[in-house]
Curated annotation (Swiss-Prot):
Gene: dxs
Annotated family: Belongs to the transketolase family. DXPS subfamily.
Entry-linked InterPro entries: Dxylulose-5-P_synthase, THDP-binding, Transketo_C/PFOR_II, Transketolase-like_Pyr-bd, Transketolase_BS, Transketolase_C
Subunit structure: Homodimer.
GO BP: any one term: thiamine biosynthetic process
Lineage top rank: taxon: Bacteria
GO molecular function: 1-deoxy-D-xylulose-5-phosphate synthase activity; magnesium ion binding; thiamine pyrophosphate binding
The protein's name: 1-deoxy-D-xylulose-5-phosphate synthase
Cofactors demanded by this protein: Mg(2+); thiamine diphosphate
Reaction catalysis annotation: D-glyceraldehyde 3-phosphate + pyruvate + H(+) = 1-deoxy-D-xylulose 5-phosphate + CO2
């Protein structure tokens, strides 16, 4: 291939054992080549970009010093692990990253023994690594080291503090590396972010560290007895200052740093020096997200996952969206601002996703009425509940897959009290290339059993706006609105804000042979499949948009149950426990026995690929729906006695 870069060192590194054959003086060149390889690959094969550039030196140093995969490295979130993948046998396959059948977007033990723990969500690395350290000790593997790499805002998550609290009371050989780049996807927020900044810039603490280091350096001139005495004095001085200014030392976790996270030789030296120190330790690195690529260093949020770009000029290759429908996320943002201008009780809450979910629109217009609470989904829900309890009306926007982490908070802190909290579940359904950790396919199944909770899903942008308007009306109680990532279907998306009666669906099309019941935007695919099937086979299909999973539109379902012997339910969620199950339960409870085919996500974790590819694999695309409808045409004349509810 023309202009293909040549790497004098990286080309010879297939696994970390090859890296460890180099001298420490060669590591900076390895880092430069690895960084350029990441830039080259991601310029044409989009993925998480800036985070991986920021940890190139750390990644190289870790695999150079530690005996991976025997030694364990646990990456928090994992979107910074592209360099790790390239160095661990996947460089040739890296062009398939995030593609159907290719390597996975996040570390996965099923893919490589170097990927020690599944990741994708934040703040779990310390707990997982501590568990591995305990396992190593119990098995007598005294020479096995365990490292947790946490950063990108993950220290704001409660689970990280739970892991620290547990680690502080153990003597296990655990190293926690704090990758401090002041960023999640957006800029980090909260007290921990400010604390780390103060810790990095504290003159008093840094001066004390310098003086203690200088004393210890000179101890080679002293006899053994006096050397030990000065070591004890230095440790005492460090302990005294640390207890006053360092939360980690105060928790009995030895603290080292902060150090330059882009000096690979120094990182390797320090890792080597502290590797065999027993007990929990923290090494604090200060890094720059997007390091080595100017545009990413300047605008890390945009370059978190920028899409395609020119690797030389840094110009992003953005598709022309003129005349296209808007993103559901932007419709949410604009509508929230519109509602908040009229309803002074409305507040906005998001856990570290203001730009991703478009909560930043409200933050920009009314900064005192919107909160980024950091990576803290449980807190976001309970915080919203507290505001609702005293008269405010929070719109709590959390990605569907991340809302799983706040399940008890929804039940205990909102639903039991019937509090007026609007949960906007962004990224509902199959999200595509980010894979099983990010698909929002479980929400309908796990929310449906919760009493007092209204669950809705709009088919299009107009429905989203009207559901948001409905949810903020008085005394609606907990109200969930789920909608997908990406573009809607209406170019003219603005519409009057009107109430939708809670629990009322709608008949989109009449028919006599078969009833199709859908919920959410997948109804658009169903409508096209129905039109094709009717034209090809003559079948007469009625189409109902359920709108609300809870409460169900019982009047609509009685109409369907009385009229139709064949029903197809279609949803963009897990088939176990979802909308199809709700229809089955209703029909059985009310003495209707139609034949029901359910279309949805099967009972398995769906891998990564484009949304269109994944819909096809699950039989949820237009062609899959068409096949189910036309197959039902063959059974239209079956006797009533043979019709039974079927699971599919």
């Amino acid at each position: 291939m023309k202009n293909e870069p040549t790497y004098s060192l990286l080309n010879a590194i297939n696994y970390p054992k090859d890296l460890r054959q180099l001298s420490v003086d060669q590591l900076p060149e390895v880092c430069e080549e690895l960084r350029q390889d990441i830039i080259k690959e991601l310029s044409c094969n989009p993925g998480h970009f800036a985070a991986s550039l920021g940890v190139v030196e750390l990644t190289v140093a870790l695999h150079y010093v530690y005996n991976t995969p025997y030694d364990r490295i646990v990456w928090d979130v994992g979107h910074q692990a592209y360099g790790h993948k390239i160095l661990t046998g996947r460089r040739e396959a890296f062009s398939t990253n995030r593609k159907l059948g290719g390597i996975r977007p996040f570390p996965s033990p099923e893919e490589s023994e170097y990927d020690t723990f599944t990741c994708g969500h934040a703040s779990n690395s310390i707990s997982a690594a501590l568990g591995m350290a305990v396992a190593a000790e119990r098995k007598g593997e005294k020479d096995r080291h365990v490292v947790a790499v946490i950063g990108d805002g993950s220290m704001s998550g409660g689970l990280a503090f739970e892991g620290l609290n547990n680690a502080s009371s153990t003597a296990n050989n655990l190293l926690i590396i704090l990758n401090d780049n002041d960023m999640a996807i957006d800029r980090s927020v909260g007290g921990m972010k400010q604390y780390l900044f103060n810790l990095t810039t504290s003159n008093r603490y840094n001066q004390l560290r310098f003086k203690t280091s200088r004393l210890l350096f000179k101890m080679g001139l002293l006899n053994e007895e006096r050397r030990k005495a000065l070591i004890r004095l230095g440790n005492s001085l460090k302990s005294l200052a640390a207890q006053q200014q360092n939360i980690f030392e105060g928790m009995n976790i030895r603290y080292f740093g902060p150090i330059d996270g882009h000096d690979v030789k120094n990182i390797a030296r320090i890792l080597h020096d502290i590797k065999d120190m027993q007990g929990p330790k923290i090494l604090h690195l200060h890094t720059i997200k997007g390091k080595g690529f100017g545009p990413a260093e300047k605008q890390a949020t945009i370059w978190h996952a920028p899409g395609k770009f020119d690797p030389v000029t840094g110009k992003r290759i953005v598709a022309n969206t003129d005349g296209m429908p808007p993103l559901f996320q932007d419709v949410f943002g604009h509508t929230l601002v519109e509602l908040a201008e009229k309803n002074k009780r409305i507040m906005g809450v998001t856990p570290a996703m203001p730009s991703g979910c478009s909560m930043n629109m409200l933050m920009d217009r009314m900064p005192d009425r919107a909160f980024d609470v950091g990576i803290a989904e449980g807190h976001a829900v309970t915080f919203s509940g507290g505001m609702a309890k005293d008269g405010l009306l929070p719109f709590c926007n959390i990605y569907s897959s991340f809302m799983q982490r706040a399940y008890d908070n929804i039940i205990h802190d909102v639903a039991i009290q019937k509090l007026n909290v609007v949960f906007c579940l962004d990224r509902a359904g199959l999200v595509g290339e980010d894979g099983p950790t990010h698909h929002g396919v479980f929400d309908m199944a796990y929310l449906r059993p919760i009493p007092n909770l209204t669950i809705s899903s709009p088919m299009d942008e107009h429905e989203l706006r009207r559901l948001m308007y409905t949810a903020q009306l008085p005394d609606k109680g907990p109200f969930a609105i789920r909608y997908p990532r990406g573009r809607g279907s209406l170019v003219d998306w603005e519409c009057p804000l009107e109430e939708i009666p809670v629990g009322k669906g709608r008949k989109l099309k009449d028919g006599n042979d078969l009833a199709v019941i859908t919920i959410g935007p997948i109804g658009k695919l169903a409508a096209r499949a129905i039109e094709r099937a009717e034209a090809d086979t003559g079948i007469s299909v009625a189409h109902y948009d359920l709108r609300f999973l809870k409460p169900l539109d019982e009047e609509l379902l009685h109409e369907v149950g009385k009229k139709f012997r064949h029903i197809v339910t279609i949803e963009d969620g897990i088939i176990k426990g979802g909308m199809g199950c709700a229809i089955l339960e209703f029909m059985a409870d009310n003495g209707y026995y139609p034949e029901i085919r359910r279309i949805g996500v099967p009972d398995q974790f769906i891998e990564h690929g484009s949304v269109q590819q994944l819909y096809h694999l699950c039989g949820m695309d237009e062609e899959g729906i068409y096949k189910v409808i036309t197959k039902n045409k063959l059974r239209m004349d079956a006797p009533v006695e043979s019709c039974m509810a079927t699971h599919s």
